[in-house]
Structures are given as structure tokens and as C-alpha cells.
Regions:
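Intrinsic disorder at enzyme termini
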Residues: 1-15, 205, 209-289
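Flexible, glycine/threonine-enriched loop-and-boundary segments that flank and lead into catalytic domains
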Residues: 1-24, 69, 80, 88, ...
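Non-catalytic DNA-recognition/assembly elements of restriction-modification systems
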Residues: 12-40, 189, 197, 201, ...
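Low-complexity, Lys/Gly-biased intrinsically disordered segments
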Residues: 13-16, 27-66, 81-83, 101, ...
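Proline-centric
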Residues: 20-29, 120-131, 161-181, 188, ...
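A short beta-sheet element
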Residues: 57-58, 76-139, 156, 164, ...
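Amphipathic alpha-helical coiled-coil/heptad-repeat segments
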Residues: 145-146, 166-252, 406, 426-459
Length: 459
């Protein structure tokens, strides 16, 4: 059984407070029994200055480390007052009382500084406890769970000094403490390396996916088939059909029609009205001979959306919002109805098989092909492509680094950048023969599936 003796001589059984049994030679003790009087920093909001003495708060304490870069300063007069009350020193432990509650770090440098009320200061008595051992103990799930259960307050929960002082700490023999601290350091270093390698691999996979898309839209991902009907013939057919519709008066000619042509220098140019601009930035001079080049607005109804008032939408209709689409993948991560979403704004109607493109914050790269009819936020454009464009190829093209770079460059607005309709319509689009588009999409799906399986097996 475990008992605790109090200063007045009384003894109390604390068996129900003991978290677990310890090995022989270990003992449970209160944190206040192994530290000098535990206190916290100043309770007064300080007056900061551009220079002076370092002033730390819980914002400067992360798990196991003190952030000495993003610090505040206080004037000498205030420092003298605070330092006379509490003078932190090297090897003290700073424990966050609020904010990132329960997070602690060892003071790892010999310098003069002061602390705010959000930090408690633990200074070990003598050499009975290794600072590294105590830090690892505080970081354990047992102590953290105790801290979390002791939080007080509603807005910003606080860990009161009394609960810190009475925290039960398992104390190992001093030599074993050092062995534990050394082993933990080795394991944590190994874990950090694994995490670093994982981040590197994830970054490499993202870069590989981007490179695959880049090769795909330049005709370098799958071999060409000379028997495929050239895309240029298909594009000419579309243009001829459009001219016929204009002649019949069924549609009007765009006053600022975008036309891509090849100059005498064998480079591509974009003509809009009387303006001509080079397309060298698109790097399309070496696409296969069977491919064609056009503006996005020539092969889809970019910007021609059907707006629907919310009162005309069924309660059970699918309402797609930007937050429902995972960035960079084109996956729909949640599906809500109008009743579940409770949205009052008008929506864009979309149909199964259309490519949906988020014009808002294009850097998030949210592009999806729908598997059902529904309605979406007005920041998403449903794109209906002509029958010479395979939807999966169109989606991958719009997700490619080349298109993404263009969309980000043309976006307007600082906080909420979006791609304008005119810029979207004149975006360059490389068109392979329809059969090659399918082969490209199949190859991308195959390669992406392989890369995704690698990521999945990392978890």
C-alpha cells in the first residue's frame, strides 16, 4: 500500500491515486518534493519594447524545445522588478500552464530572461533528478492525462500551480534515469529520422505526380499511334461547325476571339483581337505532330454556367462545396444534401460526367469529375467538353503544373484569388488524338494508384 505523510504529521492512504506499480527501487513522489518552490511568471501584462531583456511566454515553448527566435522584449526597469522575484536559469524546466497546456522544455542556454504567467518554472533540488528524465516523465501520457483532467476555466483552460505541485512523479534510481534519458534520446532521434524520411518521400511522390502530369500534356508519357486521327483535324471540324452556327445566326462571334497560330519562327502565338502574345512560357513547341493546340474556351463551355436559385433546388439534391473536394487529388471527401447543408445562396447546376473546376484559390488544385447530377457553389465551374475531349484527360490537364502555374499567375484578388473567365477561356490546351487521351488517362491512373499505395503503406 502507498501512504503519504503530511507536514502536520498525519498519514493518508493514497493507493487509489497511484497510476501504476513501479519496479523495485523506484518511488512515487510529488513534483513539489523534488523541486524548489514551484511558481509562475508575472501576472501583469508587460509593456514591451523593441529591445531590452528577453521575455518568454507559453507561445515560446514547444514540445521539448524553447523558441528563442520569435521572442518579445521588455525594458530594463520592468526586467529588474521581475528578475528580483524569479530568475530563470539554465537547466530549469518551463511548463506551459495555458495555450499548449502541459508542454515543457529545458532551458538550454545560459542567458538572462523573464517569463509570463502562462509558464511555470520547475527547478530541481540538487542532483537527485535528471532534468532530461523529468522532462520525459512530464511528456508521458500518464502525466499529460492528469494535467488535462486538472484544467480549469472555460475560455482558455488553465493548469493551476497547485495541480502542478501535487503531480505524482515516478522516480527511478539516478543511474537508471540517465540510461532512460539516453535511450529515449536515441529513440526520439530515430523517430525524427523516420518522420523526416516520410516527409521527404511524400514530397518526392507529390513531385513525381506533378512530373507525370507534365509529361502527359506534352506527349511524352505514352507512345503515339500513327493510325490515330490527328487532333488537328478534329479541332478544324469543331471550328468549321462553329463557323456554320455563326453563319446561321445561332451564335454570335466573340469580339475578342482567341486564336492560336504558329509563326514563321515555328513558335506558337495567341491572338486576341488585334493583340498577339507569345506562348513560349507554355513550352508546347515540341508536342507530337498528331496533337493539336487550342484555347480552353474552344473545346468547353468555360464560364457558361446555369445558375439556380436555392428555392428551386430539391431538399435531397446534392450540394457540392469547395470544402468537399480534397486538394490536389480530385477526391470528393464528403457529400451533403441541401437539407444537410442549409445553404441560401444560388448554385451552379452540374451533370454527371462533367469536369468541375474551382476557380477560387486555384493553387489548391481542386478538380473533380462528378458521378452524379447536383449543384455546386458559384466558385466552382461545371465544364462540358466537346466530344473530342476525354473528361479524364481534361481533368488531368487542368491539374497539371503548367495549367496551375498559369491560373495562379492570372488570378486576381489578394485574400481570395480567383481565375477570371476571360483568362480561363484563353488558357492553352494541348489536344492529343481521342484514343491517345484515353491511353494517357489510363497510364496516369495506373501510376497514381501505385504511388497512392506507397503512401497508404507508410501509415
Amino acid at each position: 500500500m502507498h501512504y503519504e505523510k503530511f507536514p502536520d504529521g498525519t498519514v493518508k492512504c493514497i493507493e487509489d491515486k497511484i497510476p501504476f506499480e513501479l519496479p523495485e527501487g523506484w518511488e512515487w513522489t510529488r513534483l513539489q518534493a523534488i523541486c524548489e518552490p514551484i511558481t509562475d511568471g508575472t501576472h501583469k501584462t508587460p509593456t514591451y519594447s523593441d529591445e531590452g531583456f528577453i521575455f518568454l511566454s507559453s507561445k515560446n515553448v514547444t514540445s521539448g524545445h524553447i523558441d528563442w527566435d520569435n521572442i518579445m522584449y521588455i525594458p530594463e526597469s520592468l526586467h529588474n522588478e521581475l528578475y528580483a522575484r524569479l530568475a530563470p536559469q539554465k537547466n530549469d524546466i518551463l511548463l506551459a500552464k495555458n495555450g499548449t497546456t502541459g508542454v515543457a522544455a529545458i532551458v538550454d542556454r545560459d542567458c538572462i530572461f523573464d517569463i509570463y504567467v502562462s509558464l511555470a518554472l520547475l527547478r530541481i533540488i540538487g542532483y537527485i533528478i535528471s532534468p532530461e528524465y523529468l522532462l520525459s516523465t512530464i511528456a508521458s501520457s500518464t502525466i499529460q492525462n492528469y494535467f488535462n483532467s486538472s484544467l480549469k476555466g472555460i475560455g482558455v483552460p488553465n493548469l493551476h500551480l497547485e495541480h502542478i505541485r501535487t503531480t505524482l512523479i515516478p522516480v527511478a534510481p539516478i543511474n537508471e534515469q540517465y540510461r532512460i534519458a539516453t535511450k529515449l534520446e536515441q529513440l526520439l532521434s530515430f523517430a525524427d529520422k523516420i518522420e523526416s524520411d516520410k516527409i521527404f518521400l511524400l514530397t518526392t511522390i507529390d513531385q513525381t505526380k506533378a512530373k507525370i502530369l507534365d509529361l502527359a500534356i506534352r506527349g511524352k508519357l505514352v507512345p503515339q499511334d500513327p493510325n490515330d486521327e490527328p487532333a488537328s483535324i478534329l479541332l478544324e471540324r469543331i471550328r468549321a461547325e462553329k463557323e456554320e452556327l455563326i453563319r446561321q445566326g445561332r451564335i454570335k462571334r466573340d469580339k475578342k476571339e482567341s486564336v492560336i497560330f504558329k509563326g514563321e519562327d515555328n513558335s506558337y502565338y495567341l491572338k486576341i483581337g488585334n493583340l498577339v502574345e507569345s506562348l513560349n512560357d507554355w513550352q508546347i513547341d515540341d508536342i507530337p505532330e498528331t496533337w493539336g493546340i487550342c484555347c480552353l474556351g474552344e473545346i468547353c463551355d468555360y464560364g457558361n454556367c446555369i445558375n439556380t436559385d436555392t428555392k428551386d433546388i430539391s431538399e435531397n439534391a446534392w450540394i457540392l462545396d469547395l470544402e468537399d473536394i480534397e486538394k490536389d487529388t480530385g477526391r470528393v471527401i464528403q457529400r451533403l444534401t441541401k437539407k444537410e447543408r442549409n445553404s441560401a445562396s444560388s448554385k451552379h447546376l452540374f451533370h454527371k460526367g462533367q469536369v468541375l473546376y474551382s476557380k477560387l484559390r486555384p493553387y489548391l488544385n481542386k478538380v473533380v469529375i462528378t458521378d452524379d447530377d447536383g449543384y455546386c457553389t458559384s466558385e466552382i465551374l461545371p465544364l462540358e467538353f466537346s466530344n473530342i475531349i476525354f473528361p479524364d484527360y481534361a481533368r488531368y490537364y487542368i491539374m497539371s503544373p503548367t495549367f496551375l502555374r498559369y491560373a495562379n499567375h492570372c488570378s486576381y484578388g489578394v485574400k481570395m484569388p480567383r481565375l477570371g473567365t476571360a483568362d480561363g477561356k484563353k488558357a492553352v490546351f494541348t489536344v492529343p488524338p481521342i484514343n491517345e487521351q484515353k491511353r494517357i488517362a489510363d497510364k496516369i491512373n495506373q501510376l497514381f494508384s501505385l504511388l497512392d499505395s506507397i503512401v497508404k503503406n507508410m501509415d
